[in-house]
């Protein structure tokens, strides 16, 4: 679709308005498609600006265009609170505003929304009226208007155009964007290089693209905010980012990009804290402990520990970043190999008959090579030695433990089998030997996530969890990663009875786990992975 710059020409909407951009030809979609698309954009302003986190709908009303009478008041949730230090402009003004046009239009939908930026300590929260107007008689004309609740140019935050009103018009088969400029600023809108003019083009592109999507029957591939409420998560994220992000970025000790890892782990911490509040209720931090299996750089553990949650992180290799944390955090980060106890303990049925048996008598050869050896050698570990080794964690946790697998790679498929409530965010696909493998995705997952190794892994982890009795939930996390599916399980009738026979059966169905100890010891020599 080609867009024509109007150069600040007079607008069909009237003398106060200025036309900025319009489509060069008919758009092809109908008014209903335009209104459906713009309703979604009004409710999700982050579509137009990545600076914005969300919109809280303060008021919503529908009118009969012919009579002007209100026919529906929408149910509106609470608007965002403004914490100390956050910026805001005119939030006490919640009365819907109106606008004059020379077209014979009447209000169909009226919203007052509160725009919440990602960093409200830098960008101000504002209220804004959003109107959807139609002609009184049936036609294909519709207008969407945005009216900020301030009247001075100086009050305008960076994330919206610096104008008094924005109009997106569908009329005569074409789409166009119009502004009402602040006093004395109309001449600047004739310059295509101005930020407000460039923004008008993006607004037109978004409206045209999303309207065509509605016409073509577009549906979202994934749903967010299924398990944890979006507002609760986002408010928690803002709090944690304010407290921890700057220090973590400034003191980053790894060679990886600090901003990606820091903000991703802050988002995961925010999600976990709200999830735990949902599961355990008030004062959740007093009711359980966490274990982050494959904790990597330790940032997630650091945030959770600093927020008052008891727990620990385990990884096969110590990271440089561990040294930057305070002693109370460093003492909770453990350099250990995870070797699940079901590989070392007697089968539960055998222990019933011989309760004195602490290990299964197994021996595990591990091939090693070194420049200090005359030739490759084999070390044989016994189950008894591995159970008592301080360098090994056999994943026998207290009953009030919640397991976290945040891109935990080789451990991912093991975590649902360990008999504790868990959240796993799969990343790289491995079997119970620790070897790379590709699992086939279901038809549904292939449609939503693509016919990929990742989709297959997510499906397999969910299958494993259900096979051993977990009621599972899935959430597509709001994190800066394409591998953002979280599988969650915290209800299981067999809780306290693991490892069950189903656990042994699933390990055997997937080829057993004889190679796990060899693979686990190899992790000690490899380079730590970065996701």
Curated annotation (Swiss-Prot):
Q: Which GO terms describe its biological process?
A: tRNA methylation; tRNA nucleoside ribose methylation
GO MF terms here are:
tRNA (uridine) methyltransferase activity; tRNA(Ser) (uridine(44)-2'-O-)-methyltransferase activity
Protein name (Swiss-Prot/TrEMBL): tRNA (uracil-O(2)-)-methyltransferase
**Reaction equation(s) it catalyzes:** uridine(44) in tRNA(Ser) + S-adenosyl-L-methionine = 2'-O-methyluridine(44) in tRNA(Ser) + S-adenosyl-L-homocysteine + H(+)
Provide this UniProt record's keywords sorted from A to Z.
Cytoplasm, Methyltransferase, S-adenosyl-L-methionine, Transferase, tRNA processing
Q: Does the keyword S-adenosyl-L-methionine apply?
A: yes
Top enzyme category: transferase
Top-level taxon: Eukaryota
Q: Does the keyword Cytoplasm apply?
A: yes
> Per the similarity annotation, which family is this?
Belongs to the TRM44 family.
Q: Where does this one sit in the cell?
A: Cytoplasm
């Amino acid at each position: 679709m080609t867009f024509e710059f109007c150069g600040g020409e007079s607008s069909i909407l009237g003398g106060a308005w200025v036309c900025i951009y319009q489509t060069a030809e008919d758009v092809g979609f109908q008014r209903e498609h335009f209104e459906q698309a713009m309703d979604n954009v009004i409710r999700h302003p982050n579509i137009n600006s990545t600076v914005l986190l969300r919109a809280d709908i303060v008021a919503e009303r529908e009118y009969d265009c012919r009579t002007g009478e209100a026919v529906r008041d929408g149910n509106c949730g609470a608007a965002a609170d403004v914490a100390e230090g956050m910026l805001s402009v005119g939030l006490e003004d919640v009365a819907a505003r109106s606008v004059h046009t020379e077209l014979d239009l009447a209000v169909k939908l009226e919203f007052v929304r509160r725009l919440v930026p990602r960093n409200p300590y830098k960008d101000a929260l504002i209220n804004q009226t959003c109107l959807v107007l139609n002609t009184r008689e049936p036609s294909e004309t519709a207008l969407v208007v945005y009216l900020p609740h301030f009247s001075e140019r100086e009050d305008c935050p960076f994330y919206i155009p610096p104008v008094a009103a924005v109009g997106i018009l569908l009329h005569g088969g074409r789409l166009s964007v119009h502004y009402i400029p602040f006093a004395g600023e109309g001449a600047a809108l004739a310059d295509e290089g101005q930020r407000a003019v460039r923004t008008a083009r993006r607004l037109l592109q978004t409206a045209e693209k999303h309207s065509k999507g509605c016409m073509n029957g577009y549906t979202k591939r994934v749903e967010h905010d299924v398990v944890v409420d979006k507002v609760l998560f986002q408010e928690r994220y803002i709090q944690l980012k304010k407290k921890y992000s700057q220090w973590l970025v400034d003191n980053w000790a790894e060679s990886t990009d600090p901003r990606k890892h820091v903000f991703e782990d802050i988002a995961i911490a925010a999600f976990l804290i709200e999830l735990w509040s949902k599961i355990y209720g008030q004062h959740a931090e007093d009711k359980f402990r966490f274990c982050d299996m494959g904790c990597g750089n330790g940032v997630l553990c650091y945030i959770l520990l600093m927020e008052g949650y008891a727990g620990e992180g385990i990884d096969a290799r110590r990271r440089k970043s561990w040294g930057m944390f305070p002693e109370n955090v460093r003492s909770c980060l453990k350099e250990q190999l995870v070797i699940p106890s079901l590989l070392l303990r007697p089968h539960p049925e055998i222990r019933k008959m011989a309760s004195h048996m602490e290990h299964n008598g197994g021996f595990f050869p591990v091939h090693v090579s070194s420049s200090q050896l005359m030739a490759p050698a084999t070390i044989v570990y016994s189950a008894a030695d591995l159970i008592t080794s301080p360098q090994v964690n056999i994943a026998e946790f207290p009953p009030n433990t919640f397991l976290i697998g945040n891109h935990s790679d080789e451990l991912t498929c093991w975590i649902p089998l360990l008999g504790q409530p868990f959240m796993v965010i799969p990343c790289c696909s491995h079997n119970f030997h620790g070897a790379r493998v590709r699992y086939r995705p279901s038809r549904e997952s292939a449609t939503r996530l693509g016919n990929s190794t990742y989709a297959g892994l997510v499906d397999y982890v969910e299958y494993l969890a259900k096979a051993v009795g977990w009621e599972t939930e899935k959430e597509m996390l709001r994190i800066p990663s394409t591998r953002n599916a979280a599988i969650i399980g915290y209800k299981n009738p067999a809780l306290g009875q693991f490892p069950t026979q189903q656990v042994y059966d699933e390990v055997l169905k997937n080829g057993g786990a004889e190679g796990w100890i060899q693979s686990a010891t190899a992790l000690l020599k490899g380079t730590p992975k970065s996701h």
